Design a protein with these regions (language model features):
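Short, Lys/Arg-rich, polar N-terminal cytosolic tail immediately upstream
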Residues: 1-5
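Interfacial segments of alpha-helical transmembrane regions
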Residues: 6-16, 60-78, 146
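C-terminal TM-helix exit segments that contain a strictly Trp-centered aromatic cap at the helix terminus
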Residues: 24-29, 76-91
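Membrane-interface helix caps and helix-loop-helix hairpins in membrane proteins
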Residues: 30-38, 86-87, 127
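Non-cytosolic membrane-interface motifs at loop->transmembrane helix junctions
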Residues: 33-44, 96-99
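Membrane-interfacial alpha-helical segments at the cytosolic side of multi-pass membrane proteins
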Residues: 48-60, 142-153
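Extracytosolic (periplasmic/ER-lumenal) interhelical loops and adjacent juxtamembrane/interface segments
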Residues: 90-134
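A hydrophobic membrane-anchoring alpha-helix module
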Residues: 117-158
């Protein structure tokens, strides 16, 4: 039995995954009380844009441009998440944005407050089955890119 994914189906799958990822991040942050680091926030951006492109792609599924945009978005997501996962596991150093919230601190009180709020990118606070959310995002983003490329090239060579 051969499983084939049609273009409309990939848009629906990615749409539901993107919505679930955003809602999960909001739940983890606001209900469970885990504060995200800057890279965690950056990883949400491709998901927000992908929701828009998935709606477009579902209705205009014959256009290659929308699928290519989706591939680019999740390639960016893969890079950001992979970099974040690398920081968490010590493969890369934290960039300046991870370690300092605000360089324009005026008073001692603001300095102390910024130290308590600052979240390090190398601390994986929330894990599922022992893998951080950035690790899962890296894997799933790469999977979406591979499946989307397969659909794009398979339909062209069909």
């Amino acid at each position: 039995m051969k499983i084939t994914l049609k273009r409309k189906n990939i848009y629906l799958i990615v749409l539901f995954y993107s919505i679930a990822a955003i809602l999960s991040a909001i739940y983890i942050e606001n209900i469970l009380g885990y504060l995200p680091c800057k890279l965690c926030l950056y990883q949400r951006i491709p998901f927000i844009f992908s929701i828009f492109f998935c709606f477009l792609g579902y209705y205009y599924f014959k256009s290659d441009k929308i699928l290519i945009y989706l591939i680019l978005l999740f390639s960016i997501s893969f890079i950001i998440a992979g970099y974040h996962f690398g920081i968490e596991n010590g493969f890369f150093e934290e960039f300046g944005g991870c370690s300092a919230n605000n360089l324009e601190i005026i008073s001692k009180k603001e300095l102390l407050e910024s130290l308590t709020i600052n979240i390090s990118c190398k601390d994986a606070i929330f894990k599922i089955f022992g893998v951080s959310l950035s690790g899962w995002n890296t894997f799933i983003s790469l999977l979406i890119v591979i499946i989307s490329l397969r659909i794009l090239f398979y339909e062209k060579n069909k």
